[in-house]
Curated annotation (Swiss-Prot):
Job description of the protein: RNA-dependent RNA polymerase which replicates the viral genome composed of 3 RNA segments, RNA1, RNA2 and RNA3.
Assembly notes: Interacts with replication protein 1a.
Superkingdom of this protein's organism: Viruses
Similarity field: Belongs to the ssRNA positive-strand viruses RNA-directed RNA polymerase family.
Organism classification: Viruses, Riboviria, Orthornavirae, Kitrinoviricota, Alsuviricetes
UniProt keyword Ubl conjugation present: no
GO BP, sorted A to Z: DNA-templated transcription; positive stranded viral RNA replication
The protein's name: RNA-directed RNA polymerase 2a
Biased composition (Polar residues): 804-816, 824-840
Reactions that this protein is recorded to catalyse: RNA(n) + a ribonucleoside 5'-triphosphate = RNA(n+1) + diphosphate
Length: 857
């Protein structure tokens, strides 16, 4: 029993009833098509040629329609071009004519309506006959091409009453899209024969070689409103109402695209582009918009407030020694930045400042981990470490090299600091449990918008003397190089001569990233971490007595800050300045990561100290809670995660190679640093400039694709505008070009005073007065002819002669009045050298102070 084919409806289309044909339906459709084609060939007879002048006796212009409108003249071009001429055309020519007249809609490789040669030629013959027949209707018949299309699609032969044949069709689309035009299209019967595959003679929807995704892709950008328009409705109708009322409310629309005309009005270019000239005001505006709390930040007197205000702190087992403090640190002044980027002044290691830093960095050790079997679990973690990261064959064939040469390099490096082979102590006679302590005078830039409520606390350094570090550093350096040589290919440690962040043949795009942020990393380490390091060092080949010795004096230690007079005992936490700091932090991070995540799911793994970054094709799977419950770490999985490690973004160029780019936000903050010492010849400023150039050597590799990547990563990480990052790159390009451009960012108050006091006018006169008195100022006695260095003037040959105020030794018999008069007369005004008006600029007048004379204006 044959069931009728399902009718076309939205419900049948959604539930899959429509469009699924059985083999019986396919055979029935093919037989019907064969019968229609045979009938068309049998019934077709070419019409006899008709002379237009004989068949139409009346004048074309005199022929009137019932409504009084003149009839449209018939074009001879289409009348004389009979249907028999189309029978002689090739298939390609017929396809061109079909596209010209019917204008089918192309969907992928399909046409709607489909091309049928017999139906197309029959439509042409019928259209020719209709144009020659007398007109009895008051409606305007379509032109020849539109009439052929109407006959072929079985639609209306006449134009609608609203628009005539010679009028321009109106765009009835609800959206004004340049280049697109939407024309009304009458409804058809809805039946279209399915396309047949030429290869397997099956319906194309059921053919295995039919690419349905290719059919969906060109239609993905089309919307519901492009195919249908609303008729006769008042108000806004939602999509649900439209879908439930398709029939009575909607009219099909035919969409076609034409080339957009060239605009006659040119759009003015945007003046705020990254390629425009960069000035200091633009860089400051970038800082103000990106770092809103940093632009008004000034900590010139913050430490004064700390020292003078009431202070309360809670520490256990702290020892204070206030008898031999260093009250003042000699300082010759620093360069003043023009940019205000929130950088702080250098911190002085006073007692209160050191106690505040110890409270944050060393005291209050968190206790987040659970109770575990330390010996058993530490061995398991070390075993997982070697399985995940180490190539066993390379480790077995590798050994220690360059230990002695590393020791010699270390001694040569610190030779200028007074370190020599004769000063090396006997380690067995030294108490290695005592560490020196200090705070970093330079505070790390803050990228969060919290400077208005939070004062950054400086970091601390716990270290041994250079004479002790020099005997452990060569061993750990050689061991670290061996460790790098034995790593698997996908593991990268971006430090040293062997490895870096440059990865050839690896693209960071289209990959999942995993970045773990470990807070309070140094002071959170305990005995469990120390045992893990001991097992790993023994496995890497470090001599067991040295490993045992090193771990023993890290179990309990005592730190002391001699400058601040503060001492405090500490236990297992990391010593931030000894020979094993970076190596130890790196292997601890790698061991924790291997226990929490399966390293085989990552294509690349990067580790550096407490920083880690992984790349994978699929979302990483692991348990990050073990960082807290097992390792006593405050861990945070960065979301959204971007390729960022060691304060650098990782970008890929067009060739699939990855390189590192320093964080633009931190580099802009470094442009406003206040730690550059002042010097007359700008040697310290030039050294800082060379460091800036070395960090930004990546600028030559930045293409537009890399700039777009950096903007996206910058916006994802900081939730700030990515366009600001592109503007920062323009500023970096300017200030790395030459040293003169970089000098615009800094000035000195000394130079300002020098420019104020350096002037030359022809009306200025100098009167010399003999004076042989001694001068005294700030408790230092000098003669007037004593030599001392003075800042160089702004004129060639102009040296300022600055004299010190001296005062003769007073006796008990002199009165106070005579002392004031003598002191007043001995004071002189410092004046610059005045050029003689009758000599050239190369000659100069000898300063009067060098002759032992006073100067008076």
């Amino acid at each position: 029993m044959a069931f009728p084919a399902p009718a076309f409806s939205l419900a049948n289309l959604l539930n899959g009833s429509y469009g699924v044909d059985t083999p019986e339906d396919m055979e029935r459709l093919r037989s019907e098509q064969r019968e229609e084609a045979a009938a068309a060939c049998r019934n077709y007879r070419p019409l006899p040629a008709v002379d237009v002048s004989e068949s139409v006796t009346e004048d074309a212009h005199s022929l009137q329609t019932p409504d009084g409108a003149p009839a449209e003249a018939v074009s001879d071009e289409f009348v004389t071009y009979g249907a028999e001429d189309y029978l002689e055309k090739s298939d390609d020519e017929l396809l061109v004519a079909f596209e010209t007249m019917v204008k089918p809609m192309r969907i992928g490789q399909l046409w709607c309506p489909a091309f049928n040669k017999c139906s197309f030629i029959s439509s042409i013959a019928m259209a020719r006959a209709l144009l020659l027949a007398p007109r009895t209707s008051h409606r305007t018949m379509k032109c020849f091409e539109d009439l052929v299309a109407a006959i072929y699609t079985k639609s209306d032969f006449y134009y609608s009453e609203e628009c005539e044949a010679d009028d321009v069709q109106m765009d009835i689309s609800s959206r004004d899209v340049p280049g697109y035009s939407f024309e009304p299209w009458s409804r058809t019967s809805g039946f279209e024969p399915p396309p047949i595959c030429e290869a397997c003679d099956m319906i194309m929807y059921q053919c295995p070689c039919f690419d349905f995704n290719a059919l969906k892709k060109p239609c993905a950008e089309r919307t519901f409103a492009d195919d249908y328009v609303i008729e006769g409705l008042d108000g806004v109708v939602d999509n649900a109402t439209l879908l439930s009322n398709l029939g009575p409310f909607l009219v099909p629309v035919k969409c076609q695209y034409e080339k957009c005309p060239t605009p006659t009005i040119a759009i003015p270019p945007n003046l705020n582009r990254a390629t425009d000239r960069v000035d200091i005001n633009l860089v400051q505006s970038i800082c103000d918009s990106t770092l809103p709390t940093h632009s008004n930040y000034d900590d010139s007197f913050h430490q004064v407030f700390v020292e003078s205000a009431d202070y309360s702190i809670d520490l256990d087992h702290v020892r204070l020694r206030q008898s031999d403090l260093i009250a003042k640190i000699p300082d010759s002044g620093h360069m003043i930045p023009v940019l205000n980027t929130g950088s702080g002044h250098k911190r002085v290691g006073t007692t209160k400042e050191v106690l505040t830093a110890i409270k944050k960095r060393n005291a209050d050790v968190p206790e987040l981990g659970d109770s575990v079997n330390l010996s058993r679990l530490s061995k398991a973690v070390a075993e997982r470490f070697f399985i995940s990261y180490i190539n066993g064959n390379s480790l077995a064939s590798s050994n220690f090299v360059n230990v002695v040469s590393n020791f010699h390099d270390y001694m040569e490096k610190w030779k200028s600091s007074g370190l020599s082979y004769d000063d090396l102590p006997d380690l067995h006679a030294e108490n290695l449990q005592f560490y020196d302590h200090m705070i970093k005078s330079d505070v790390k830039p803050v990228v969060s918008d919290t400077l208005n409520i939070d004062r950054p606390v400086p970091a601390t350094i716990t270290y041994h003397k250079k004479s002790i570090t020099s005997q452990f550093s060569p061993l750990f350096t050689a061991l670290f190089e061996r460790f790098q040589r034995c790593l698997r290919e996908r593991i990268i440690l971006p430090v040293g001569k062997i490895s870096s962040l440059e990865m050839a043949g690896f693209d960071v795009k289209n990959k999942y990233c995993l970045e773990i942020d470990l807070s309070k990393f140094d002071k959170s380490q305990g005995e469990f971490h120390l045992l893990i390091q001991e097992h790993i060092l023994n496995g890497l080949g470090c001599p067991a007595p040295i490993t045992k010795w090193w771990c023993d004096f890290h179990r309990f230690s005592y730190i002391r800050d001699r400058r601040a007079g503060v001492g405090m005992p500490i236990s297992f936490q990391r010593r931030t300045g000894d020979a094993f700091t970076y190596f130890g932090n790196t292997i601890v991070t790698m061991a924790e990561f291997a226990w929490c995540y399966d390293t085989d799911q990552f294509e690349k793994l990067l580790f550096s100290g407490d920083d880690s970054l992984g790349f994978s094709q699929l979302p990483p799977v692991g348990d990050s809670s073990k960082f807290t419950t097992l390792y006593n770490m405050e861990a945070k999985v960065m979301e959204p995660s971007v390729p960022y490690i060691c304060s650098k973004f990782l970008l890929s160029d067009e060739f699939g190679n990855t390189f590192s780019v320093p964080d633009p936000l931190r580099e802009v903050q470094r442009l406003g640093t206040k730690k550059i010492p002042y010097s007359d010849n700008d040697e310290f400023l030039f050294a800082h400039f060379m460091q800036f150039v070395d960090r930004l050597k990546f600028l030559d590799r930045m293409s537009q694709s890399c700039i777009d990547q950096l903007s996206i990563f910058f916006e994802l990480k900081y939730k700030k505008s990515g366009e600001e990052a592109a503007l920062m790159l323009g500023a970096f390009k300017k200030y790395t070009a030459n040293f003169q451009s970089y000098k615009e960012l800094y000035y000195s108050d000394r130079r300002q005073c020098e420019l104020i006091n350096s002037f030359c006018i022809s009306e200025f006169r100098v009167e010399r007065v003999n004076s042989n008195k001694q001068r005294k100022k700030h408790g230092i006695e000098r003669r007037c002819n004593d030599k001392r260095r003075t800042p160089t003037g702004s004129y060639g040959g102009g040296e300022e002669a600055e004299t010190k105020v001296s005062q003769t030794e007073s006796t008990g018999t002199r009165s106070q009045k005579s002392q004031r008069e003598s002191a007043f007369k001995s004071q002189t005004v410092p004046l610059p050298t005045v050029l003689s008006s009758g000599r050239s600029g190369t000659d100069r007048v000898i300063p009067p102070c060098e002759r032992g004379e006073g100067t008076r204006a």
